[in-house]
Amino acid sequence: MRVVSEEALSRHLAALRPTMPRVVAGGNGATPWTVLRLVDDALPAYRLFVLNAAPGLPERDGVVLETPFIGAGMRGRPGLEYLPCRLSLVPAMLRTSTPPDVVLVTTSPPRNGTVSLGTEVNVLPAAIEAVHSRGGLVIAEVNRAMPYTFGDAVIDMGDPEGAPDIETQLLFED
């Protein structure tokens, strides 16, 4: 992963293919709102897959919401595509029928060359693995308030040098 500016990330997203990419984002209390706003500004159309989404997701033509677990941010939304699936089977779904092109996560600040998904681990490690297998993108929004947790939450980001201590920082991996 490398640190990028919002402008550089927006340019990269605008060049993304296919024309209707699937974006998987962290849900619950760990939605990467800054990165999600950039994705929404850069992509005219995309599928947004979120578990237990909070209110505030993009509401416009061209955005198709997908989820196997409908949270407050998706209830009653027109065009919502409910994907019936047990939570334990979501990783298999991400590998097969709903593979991601982009994964958006909120992470802790870097520590010894790694970041942590903190409180939002559930299906994100599987989403990251699936997007890596397809040559897709992982975009992390670093938040100082996200705790560093261990186990499957830990992501190797390479050399952490040059990662300034700021409120929100964007990391990009392609």
Question: PLM ranges: what are they?
Answer:
Residues 1-174:
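Conserved alpha/beta enzyme-core scaffold
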